[in-house]
């Protein structure tokens, strides 16, 4: 009888461990204060995005300590988080995702840059590119959107829609 109870307790304990291991471990980093958005100014991000020659150059500029663009420390380890840049392409739309690297295989989306090419019309000979920089609502609050205006279309925007272009990872 004692052996039966021990075996039953063992299986009950194993069941509890399996159930707790199945819980979703994905989570979002939530801003502790409203000032966290000051640590990465999306207008400054838009400025260096327009000045960059490609996405690799953009990522380097985001993380360059001499440029002082980012001061994010989302994992609160006392160091500025590295920002990586990813690209997702579909048709005439491109989404550039800026993610903070929090740890090994742990990333938090900070902002996205959404580009959409409008086809050339009779009134304009070249296609127009609409750009929106959208801050993560957990960090910047809801509806934090910046639409930059560039006097001259940045050179590398044309590369996004070339037949030989490969997305940046």
Predicted features by range, described:
Residues 1-25:
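Bacterial Sec-dependent N-terminal signal peptides
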Residues 23-44:
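Short N-terminal segments immediately surrounding and downstream of signal-peptide cleavage
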Residues 38-63:
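Start-of-domain marker
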Residues 92-95, 141:
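Extracytoplasmic/secreted cell-surface and envelope-processing proteins
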Residues 99-169:
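Low-complexity segments
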């Amino acid at each position: 009888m004692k052996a039966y109870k021990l075996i039953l307790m063992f299986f009950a304990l194993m069941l509890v461990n399996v159930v707790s291991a199945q819980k979703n471990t994905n989570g979002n980093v939530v801003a502790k204060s409203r000032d966290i958005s000051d640590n990465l100014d999306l207008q400054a991000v838009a400025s260096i995005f327009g000045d960059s020659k490609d996405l690799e150059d953009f990522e380097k500029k985001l993380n360059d300590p001499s440029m002082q663009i980012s001061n994010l420390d989302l994992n609160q380890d006392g160091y500025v988080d590295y920002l990586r840049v990813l690209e997702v392409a579909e048709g005439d739309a491109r989404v550039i995702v800026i993610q903070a690297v929090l740890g090994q295989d742990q990333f938090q989306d900070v902002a996205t840059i959404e580009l959409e090419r409008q086809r050339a019309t009779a009134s304009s000979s070249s296609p127009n590119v609409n750009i929106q920089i959208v801050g993560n609502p957990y960090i910047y609050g809801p509806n934090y959107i910046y639409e930059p205006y560039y006097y001259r279309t940045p050179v590398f925007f044309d590369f996004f829609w070339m037949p030989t272009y490969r997305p940046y990872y």
